[in-house]
Design a protein with these regions (language model features):
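A glycine- and charged-residue-rich anion-binding loop/surface
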Residues: 1-871
Length: 871
């Protein structure tokens, strides 16, 4: 029975027993901060077990996606360890109990999937006579096949708990140990656990006593992959049809054979398991990052990439495997099938990023371990582990795994200290930035009622500060902070800059440069006395720069529209990671895994402008946080909210919690234009945009530019693009002609270099120092040289390209590759002599070095490497 058929058979069987079949829940727990990822079938159903939520049915069955990474280092080294797996389960919430659970488990195993009854064994809790009798008297399980084990009791601290009963499959004495009393519960591989039935019937009290539960529950779990291995007669889960096609695809890519080399098999299993894991995680919305679930994903993905390198795979290989994973799991898991392209884009982006630093990081680590070994040390310093993490993207667990393969451990405390030091530096930098404007002690204002009202135009001065000093009077030229009783100025927050304007008193004027808020909420104004003086107690006029505020309102509302448009075009994984709203432009940082394409940018810009043209009135209201959540409001990055929140809604398009300035109608934004998009960190992108007059001015600038180009190209503006294509085509044709001339020159050079051909055994080998101005020329020479050898042999060419640069290219014909020669090894040996490195495919590789003077020595080293391979 195929794995997908087994899943379907299980779910259909329990549907026939009155269970509601639910699709697998996401791997991301919903409203459960105690869990990082779902690791068991019952985990997403916990609210039903605890009574917090009423289940849609008192009988439920699922095939739940699960993720466990506690034993990551064992994955690939044992028959059963996985990160990702599916847990088949049937559950009862105060409905049926022990007898039915046991009867149905036995019926499914023996009648539906037809396992041999004589090879099934069960264990029960010693005091659970009801379970024992049900197995023996009702199901007919022989007493010799029932074992009482103290371990068969499920509990985690106080709360619901109860005995459980495990079902085992006897794999045969050849899998067992020498103990004549070997039975279920033994540590050997003979008895394989395939199903666990948990009978939740007690409540453990604080004093350690157990009281019967009023409503008893059933929680069962059977690993799909494990059950499939039994049905398909496989030695390990990895050989089932749920996983083995991924191993086959990986082996083909690496040019290796499964089940020939134990170390190779470990890497093949690791990659197969991890390909399933990253597919499931990303399809559920997890993206690579350096914390939380994102770190789990990054750690698994990069571990897979590293094992690909151990197999000799160069370049991208994990991304194509996603197609194989989807072919297997897609029919049974909708989310995986629906997100195939999205998953591949995320994996390719992360794979490319790690490949850029992997080789350097591995070299550094191996060199470091060599040095430590020479010094008789056995611990990799924490500072070096941190360097690999910070500079080369090595999760510390990956460094630990590589180190352990060579008999080393890592200094965990030193690594944590280095991490803490980096965080402290970042925190101090933030504190320094925040402390640029000092304010005096304002505790004397604690009994004052300070208000904010944008309609107010007059108030009184409560406090003046200069640095940390409180002033009674500030004179012309003083840079000060001012607190008034009621202010119409908006404080900086939510990414929006603070208001500017003037505070005008009877004796002078203060120009307000910015408005901020102290941690406890008091609004203060930062400014300079530009006329006369100002004193505490003065009655003052408050003049906000309303034109500037209106410009920020346009940009702030446009930011909300942009956020919503990003989610609609790129996906719901997009979240705000920072923002800046100024009068002149807006900046928006968001989580996304790859550069946004021009087509996507065009869609985003068009969506925002469509909302502007709809002239929609904004709905702005205060409400409870629960009400806001019910409306689907998005909370913004870095903001903290009280019980009552302000909700800004563009009906039908965007709902966010926000305290900033906004237009009353989207039409007031006038126009929206994207100006840039770029990455600013791992998994974080930045968009900048303009609105209103600035957007219109930019459009005018573009029009004038096109008109000038039309003049230069001697055409009219509407035909500029067509004419430009003509000019570029002509230039391309000229370049092709020049390239043909260059190739003819190279062909002549190729004829010269094979004059130095030597035979290593029956293999023709050419190593030559040539003149070339680019790596493309070197590749051409190598190609032509191999052609001159009648397509059989090895060509290694090198060229100095400046005082401190030398490049190499190696080509190996397929028949010589079959003899064990790999271009990557040959070119690497050459480049290392010249102070460099490189690699590539078995048939073609290139490398670079820093010491052109050693070119001839390097070519000789390449020949020596080939000789050692062939002999």
């Amino acid at each position: 029975m195929k794995g997908n058929e087994l899943r379907q058979a299980y779910l259909q069987f329990f549907e026939s027993k009155g269970h509601l079949k639910l699709d697998s829940f996401s791997l991301i727990p919903e409203n459960d901060p105690s869990l990082l990822l779902i690791g068991a079938g019952m985990a997403p159903l916990k609210p039903f077990f605890t009574g917090k939520l009423v289940p849609p049915c008192h009988r439920i069955t699922t095939s739940q996606k699960c993720m466990r990474t506690g034993d990551l280092e064992n994955v690939g080294r044992t028959a059963r360890h996985h990160t990702f797996f599916e847990m088949l389960g049937n559950f009862s919430f105060g409905d049926y109990f022990k007898k039915e659970a046991i009867h149905w488990a036995w019926e499914f195993l023996t009648e539906v999937i037809k396992l041999d009854k004589n090879r099934l064994y069960v264990t029960v809790y010693p005091d659970d006579q009801e379970a024992y009798d049900t197995w023996h008297n009702d199901c007919g399980v022989e007493e010799s096949h029932i074992t009482r084990l103290e371990d068969n009791f499920w509990e985690i601290g106080e709360g619901p708990c109860g005995p459980d009963s495990e079902i085992f499959f006897d794999q045969g004495p050849e899998h067992g140990c020498d103990d004549p009393n070997c039975a279920p519960g033994c540590d050997c591989d003979r008895y394989l656990e395939i199903w666990n039935l948990v009978f939740t019937q007690f409540n453990k009290m604080p004093d350690g006593s157990y009281e019967p539960l009023q409503h008893k529950n059933i929680d069962t779990g059977a690993g799909l992959e494990r059950l499939a291995s039994v049905l398909q007669g496989c030695k390990t889960n990895f050989e089932t049809d749920l996983i083995f096609p991924i191993i086959e695809a990986t082996a083909k890519c690496a040019g290796v054979t499964y089940n020939e080399n134990p170390n190779t098999d470990v890497s093949l299993k690791v990659i197969a398991d991890h390909a399933r894991a990253v597919t499931a995680l990303i399809s559920d919305g997890v993206l690579p990052s350096n914390e939380g679930r994102g770190y789990v994903l990054r750690r698994i993905l990069r571990r897979a990439v590293r094992h690909g390198r151990l197999l000799g795979i160069e370049g991208i290989f994990l991304t194509p495997l996603i197609d194989v994973v989807v072919d297997i799991l897609g029919p049974g898991i909708k989310s995986i099938a629906e997100k195939q392209d999205f998953v591949k884009r995320v994996v390719q982006n992360e794979e490319e990023r790690f490949n850029q630093t992997l080789e350097q990081g591995l070299e550094l680590l191996n060199s470091l371990i060599d040095t430590l070994a020479a010094e008789k040390a056995t611990v990799v310093p924490g500072t070096e582990v941190f360097k690999l993490y910070d500079t080369y993207g090595f999760p510390w667990e990956l460094t630990e795994e590589i180190a352990s393969e060579r008999g080393f451990t890592i200094d965990h405390e030193g690594f944590e200290a280095a991490m803490k030091e980096q965080r402290e530096r970042a925190r101090e930098a933030r504190i320094k930035e925040d402390a640029k404007v000092a304010t005096p002690d304002i505790t004397f204002l604690k009994d004052e009622e300070l208000l904010e009202d944008e309609a107010v135009t007059a108030s009184s001065v409560l406090m003046i500060g200069k640095g940390s000093e409180r002033l009674q009077t500030a004179a012309d030229g003083d840079e000060i902070t001012v607190i008034v009783r009621t202010t119409p100025f908006h404080a900086e927050g939510g990414g929006q800059l603070g208001d500017t304007g003037f505070i005008v008193g009877p004796m002078g004027k203060v120009e307000v440069h910015n408005t901020k808020r102290l941690p406890e909420g008091t609004v203060y104004h930062i400014g300079t006395v530009v006329e006369g003086s100002i004193s505490e107690g003065d009655d003052v006029a408050l003049e906000v720069d309303t034109n500037r505020r209106a410009a920020m309102a346009r940009n702030h509302t446009a930011t909300h529209l942009l956020h919503a448009a990003l989610k609609k075009v790129l996906g719901e994984h997009v979240n705000q990671a920072g923002s800046l709203v100024t009068p002149d432009y807006l900046r928006f940082d968001f989580t996304h895994f790859s550069p946004v394409t021009q087509e996507e940018l065009d869609q985003i810009e068009a969506l925002v402008n469509e909302e502007i043209l709809k002239a929609t009135d904004l709905a702005i209201a205060e409400m409870s946080m629960d009400e806001a959540k019910a409306k689907g409001a998005m909370a913004l990055f870095g903001d903290k909210y009280g019980d009552v929140v302000r909700v800004v809604e563009v009906p039908g398009f965007s709902v966010e919690l926000c305290g900033g300035s906004h237009v009353g109608n989207t039409a007031f934004i006038s126009s929206f234009r994207l100006t840039s998009e770029a990455g600013i960190g791992s998994g974080v992108r930045r968009i900048e945009a303009i609105t209103g007059r600035a957007a219109l001015d930019a459009a005018k600038h573009d029009r004038l530019t096109i008109e000038r180009m039309a003049g230069e190209l001697k055409t009219k503006a509407p035909q500029v693009e067509e004419r430009l294509h003509q000019v570029l085509a002509e230039a391309k044709e000229t370049a092709k002609e020049l390239e043909q001339i260059r190739k003819e020159v190279s062909a002549a050079g190729a004829a010269d270099i094979i004059a130095g051909k030597v035979m290593i055994g029956d293999v023709a080998f050419v190593a030559a120092a040539v003149k070339a101005s680019s790596i493309d020329e070197l590749r051409d020479l190598a190609d032509m040289g191999l052609d001159k050898l009648a397509g059989s042999g090895v060509v290694l060419v090198g060229a100095a390209m400046g005082d401190d640069k030398v490049n190499f290219v190696c080509k190996v014909s397929k028949d010589v590759v079959a003899k064990g020669a790999k271009a990557g090894n040959i070119v690497k040996a050459a480049a290392q002599v010249a102070g460099g490195n490189g690699g590539g495919r078995p048939d073609m590789a290139q490398a670079g070095g820093k010491e052109p003077a050693k070119l001839m020595q390097a070519l000789k080293a390449g020949g020596d490497e080939l000789t050692s391979i062939l002999q």
